[in-house]
Amino acid sequence: MSEQVDLAVIGGGPAGSAAAIRGARAGASVAVFESGERGRDKICGDGLTPRAVAALKELDIPIDASHRISGLRMIAGRQIRELPWPETDRFPGYGAV
């Protein structure tokens, strides 16, 4: 069976999903081709940086305000460093989980 679409997206990860959303919202017929059966486990995949939050906002995907994170904490032995996310004109001053 063959099907014709306006936009074929290879890979259903973050970039492919964003491309598919934008294409569909622009009126294109879209097909996403993903080799994996479903999503995969990724240890660091739950944390969103301010850049990722801005990208989701640009796609009109809501972020639950109760799951905001204000920065990073790094621990090496007994040393602990905390770094707040800086707020810029391009990105919010928070990430999300």
Regions found by a protein language model. Give the residues of each.
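Conserved N-terminal helical subregion
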Residues: S2, A54, H67-R68, R73-V97
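Glycine-rich FAD pyrophosphate-binding loop
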Residues: A8, G12, A19-C44
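Gly/Ser/Thr-rich beta-alpha loop segments that engage phosphate groups in nucleotides
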Residues: G13-A18, G47-T49, G95-V97
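Short, functional N-terminal and low-complexity linear motifs
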Residues: G16-R25, R68-M74
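Short amphipathic alpha-helical segments, especially helix-boundary/capping motifs
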Residues: A26-V32, G47, I75-E82
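Generic secondary-structure boundary signal with a strong preference for alpha-helix termini
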Residues: A28-S29, S35, K57-E58, D64, ...
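N-terminal FAD cofactor-binding segment of flavoenzymes
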Residues: R40-A76
